[in-house]
Design a protein with these regions (language model features):
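A solvent-exposed interaction/effector surface
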Residues: 1-140
Length: 140
């Protein structure tokens, strides 16, 4: 649906889109990062809409105006964090899990802050993390 420079810009774009066509509030935010084995670098926020929901939007939504992302095999996990973005250690554990299972992860990471809750210690964020697979090294 769109590429935004950061989550704040993504939220503004989401409100703009959701106010134009009923149902576009089902857009998801994915922070796009790269991982070089030590550090994470953020590259902005993508607004994604699941194509399976398109039929529910009616004729007001023209999907041909938006780029489609390709389906890719990914290493996937859900973790809790005190931050809205994953730490390098979280991503390193995903890479390690992949290696253990014969999967080589690419350097790209997509993070979605699915939900958050607050307690006496502050905010906790539930992060959904995807790392596209570069290649299958060996079958388990």
């Amino acid at each position: 649906m769109g590429q935004c420079r950061d989550l704040h810009h993504g939220l503004r774009e989401w409100f703009r889109l959701a106010s134009t066509i009923s149902g576009l509030d089902m857009t998801y935010f994915y922070n796009e990062l790269t991982y070089n084995g030590r550090e994470l670098t953020q590259h902005g926020t993508q607004l994604l809409f699941y194509k399976e929901l398109e039929d529910q939007l009616g004729d007001a939504f023209d999907s041909s105006r938006y780029a489609l992302t390709e389906e890719k095999m990914c290493i996937y996990t859900v973790l809790t964090s005190r931050e809205t973005l994953p730490s390098p250690e979280m991503v390193s554990r995903m890479v390690g899990w992949g290696r253990k299972h014969g999967i080589e992860a690419g350097g790209r990471v997509y993070a979605n802050d699915m939900t958050s809750f607050f307690d006496e210690d502050g905010a906790t964020f539930c992060l959904e993390l995807y790392m596209p697979v570069r290649k299958i090294v060996s079958q388990i």
